[in-house]
């Protein structure tokens, strides 16, 4: 799958929103009962580009057209969220996939990953090896010594750049020409969760 353009860089601040879906029932007594409907968050990303050259806006425009607006998904790597020292941040309990009893190689939801811990149904798994940049879109991969059993939930903790399967939030994209050969635009992305 294609990867969102790494250049031009968006301006700061940019926004990443994590959303869960919780069903809350309130009783006559005021007591509440909550039920989690989404095990993992659905994320959205808002990017601003305040000063773009004609070639930079064309890069974004061409990518948007190739994705047919909101129709086709793509990979987005969050290479912009860093710690105070400028290093990639830690991510906890990120979805990798589900075992099928035969697959041993899975893409990690990140690249340039380190400090990785794999989990099968919440229990850490030591029998794994990692490969850097060999997955779809340049993601890192994990190989299990033996295939996770059918239905096993595979998650990971890691430090690195988070990879998200996204789509454009809207079927329209505007570009504002605010000076000779200078443009600005904003882009909103929504995570496309697996079925």
Give the residues covered by each predicted segment.
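Intrinsically disordered/low-complexity terminal segments and short unstructured peptides
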Residues: 6, 17, 21, 25, ...
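Solvent-exposed edge beta-strands and adjacent loop segments
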Residues: 1-72, 161-182
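Polar, enzyme-active/binding microenvironments
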Residues: 3-15, 119-156
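Extended beta-strand solenoid/passenger and fiber regions
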Residues: 61-132, 148, 158-195
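Residue-level detector of short, conserved catalytic/binding motifs and their immediate flanks
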Residues: 45, 116, 152
